[in-house]
A protein has these predicted regions:
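Histidine-acidic metal/acid-base catalytic patches
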Residues: 3-12, 16-147
């Protein structure tokens, strides 16, 4: 793109979902840092303008589902549309978990990327749970000021 108004929005959880090998938040931080190393080496770190900060460790579920579907294939043509939609939504929610990203190195990772914007989006069951998630994430970030 040939414009000054461009940038990258990093969705940490979506990037975590590109592998099924992550087990802990610390694994996720290491995986994200390895990716960011490449941008830093290419002198492109400044392109990151925003971050959708969330934790998604759905790898165990994905591996289990792959095995189950290989052993018991599903004929999607036989499933009514709205039931298929429900199944797909449920499946996506088990992969893309949208949990608070807490763990060793999270704050340092965010500081390293230094996004101008941070979005917190979670899967929650109530307003109270959402507020608890935001409070938990905020304690990790210590309301860091970036740029």
């Amino acid at each position: 793109m040939h414009t000054q108004r461009k940038g990258i929005m990093l969705d940490t959880g979506h990037y975590m979902n590109t592998t099924t090998q992550l087990k802990t938040p610390e694994d996720a931080v290491a995986y994200l840092n390895k990716m960011i190393d490449k941008y830093e080496k290419a002198q492109m770190l400044h392109w990151f303008k925003g971050m959708h900060l969330q934790l998604s460790l759905g790898g165990d579920y994905v591996r289990k589902q792959r095995k189950e579907w290989r052993e018991h294939p599903i004929d999607f043509d036989k499933i009514p549309f709205y039931e298929l939609f429900r199944l797909a939504y449920d499946h996506a929610c088990h992969i893309d978990l949208h949990q608070p990203f807490i763990g060793e190195g999270v704050r340092e990772f965010v500081e390293r990327v230094a996004p101008k914007y941070i979005t917190l989006e979670y899967q929650q069951n109530s307003r109270e749970e959402y507020e608890q998630f935001v409070e938990t994430q905020s304690k990790i970030l210590k309301w860091i000021t970036i740029r």
